[in-house]
From Swiss-Prot:
It comes from Escherichia coli (strain K12). Disulfide bonds: none annotated. This is Probable protease SohB. It is a single-pass membrane protein. Its main location: membrane.
Amino acid sequence: MELLSEYGLFLAKIVTVVLAIAAIAAIIVNVAQRNKRQRGELRVNNLSEQYKEMKEELAAALMDSHQQKQWHKAQKKKHKQEAKAAKAKAKLGEVATDSKPRVWVLDFKGSMDAHEVNSLREEITAVLAAFKPQDQVVLRLESPGGMVHGYGLAASQLQRLRDKNIPLTVTVDKVAASGGYMMACVADKIVSAPFAIVGSIGVVAQMPNFNRFLKSKDIDIELHTAGQYKRTLTLLGENTEEGREKFREELNETHQLFKDFVKRMRPSLDIEQVATGEHWYGQQAVEKGLVDEINTSDEVILSLMEGREVVNVRYMQRKRLIDRFTGSAAESADRLLLRWWQRGQKPLM
C-alpha cells in the first residue's frame, strides 16, 4: 500500500512537471506568433477542370468493362500528348496566347461582424492583379447582415471591382439581407434563388438596461463623459429621454445613408417602397427590382463554363491555436443567432 502511495505521488510530480513545461512552451509559441505577422494562403481551384473530370468519370461509370478499358487507354494517351505539348512550349519559352476568358468565383459567408472581409480584400486584390479583358467575377454571397462598419467595408471592397469596370455578378442561394444586401447591390447583376431572403434595407439596435435592477440591490453606477452625446443609451446607467431621442436620430441617419447607397448602386429602384426594413423571397424581389434574375449559383456557374475557364479563389487565414478555439465559439454563436433570426423572420415548412 505504501509502495502504491509513493508511486502515485511520483506520477503526480511527473504530470505536474510535464504540464508546467507544456504551459511554458505554449506561452513562448503564442508570444512568438503574436509578434510575427500571420500571412494567409491563397488557394486557387479550377472549377472547369473539376466539372470536366466529374463528367468524364460519370461517362466512364456508365460504360461496360471493355469500353472502360478502351476509354482509359485513350485518356492516358491524350494526357500524355497534352503534357508533351506543354513541355515543348515551355522549353521554347512560348506563352499561351489563346487562353480562354476567366470567371473568377469568390465566396462570402458573412458573420455578424463581417470579419470575413479580411479574406475578401485579399481575394479581390489577387483578382485585380491577374484580371484580363473579357474576364468577370461571380460572388456567392450568404449573409443576414450585421455591423454597419463591417458590411460597409465589405461593400467597399466589391466597389473596387466596379470602379475598374469589371463585370460582377452576385448570387444569393439562401440569404442576402440588410448588410448582405448592401454588398449585393454593388453588383452589375444580382441572381437569387426563388426562396432566398433578400432586402431588409433597414437598421436595428437593441440593448437591455439593468439600472433598476442594480438600484434594487443598492448598487450605484457612475458614468462620466466628456461630450454631450458621448453616451446616448447605456447598459448600466440611467437612460434619459434626450439620450433615447439622439439614439433614434442616429439610427435614422444610418438608415438614410443605407438608402442613399442602395439608390446610387441601383438607380432604377423605388427606394422608398423597398427601404422599409421588410424582406422578400427571391421571386418577390424580382418584381420589386431588388434582384435581376431567378436562378441558383450552381446554374449560373455552369452556364458560364462554355468557352470560359472558371476558377475559384479563396484566401485562407492562418490562425493561432487560441484563435481557432475562439473562432469556433464565435462561429457557433453566429450560427445560433442566424437560426433564431431566420425562424423569427419566415414561416417554417
